[in-house]
Amino acid sequence: MTTHDIYERLRERIDSYSIGMNATGNGKELAILKRLFTEEEARYYLALTRALEPAAVIAGRLGVSAAEAEKVLERMCAKGHLFPKTADGVKLYAAAPFMHGFFEHQVYRKDRDPELPRLIEDYLMGGFIPKSRALRVVPVGVGLPDRKQVLPYDDVRGIIMSKERIGLMHCACNHHMKSLGHECGQDTEVCIAFDFYAEYPIEQGFGRWIRREEALKVVERAAERGLVHQAGGDSRNVECICNCCSDCCGILRMLKRVPNAGRFLSSNYTPAFDAGACTSCGECAERCPMGAITVGDGVELNADRCIGCGVCAVGCPAGAVTMQKKPDDLVRRPPSPEKYTFMRSSIDFRADQEAAKGKG
């Protein structure tokens, strides 16, 4: 097998995970992989799955000893290729997809290849096509109707209050853009993760445990600062709440380039403007991350561009913006497990760990 074949097979495997890593025809994706993986590491990745497994199982697929496999797998963990975990003293490994996975992990590496950010940026903005939705917009709490009428999966406060294990980390997208010389001026410690996705960054040294009260303050300040709440997870479990600025977030930056962003990413709410209360100050238009609002004699909303984040409602000094629930036939519910691939559920990772107990 030639070097090109190895890396193309690696790309194909990564493309089958999460939102993929499509071929561009210009080789940008292969340039990234060659910077990230040695040929040996590429072969090891091809022997892994998204499920957590012990080194002995992976070694069996490769025809090497468990000790030899563990040595390479640990090196790959240090490079951000894998999700590691331990069960009953047995180290387990799972393949990390491009996103959410080794893209984010690279950001926090102190020994990161200095050429990598530019290569990744060129790929993201010059050919990357996500295979499926990654996150969903959750509206801010301001301007919503009676909280009792808000669906549980649209309630940021409710999601946080339902969680026991909460982690906070610096925004990977913000760090990525900083490495390219772009400073947006926003808060950076704004990404909240739960369960497995909180444990991993904290174990790797780039996150910290927080209480619910601090998490609530993070999302409240994020909303005030004009950041968009985006949640990840399937219908069983919310895995994270990212608080994103449209200058840095890869998803929002890509959507800003299309005229109908709301078709691809939107909450279950849409802003309504009270013409009597509105002073035409323009604050809502200035805050809108998608440029969906224009203000003249009144306020005009481009519904195709609106993602229903509610940032306009938070910033309105006159309180003239409320968030109205969309008709039931337009409501998007969190996807079922078989239809959501961006973040493998903490529930499934926990099942892997339980299955591995007693096998060491």
Question: What are the roles of these predicted feature ranges?
Answer:
Residues 95, 230-238, 258-308, 322, ...:
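Ferredoxin-like iron-sulfur electron-transfer modules
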Residues 90-126:
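Short, amphipathic alpha-helical interaction segments positioned at domain boundaries
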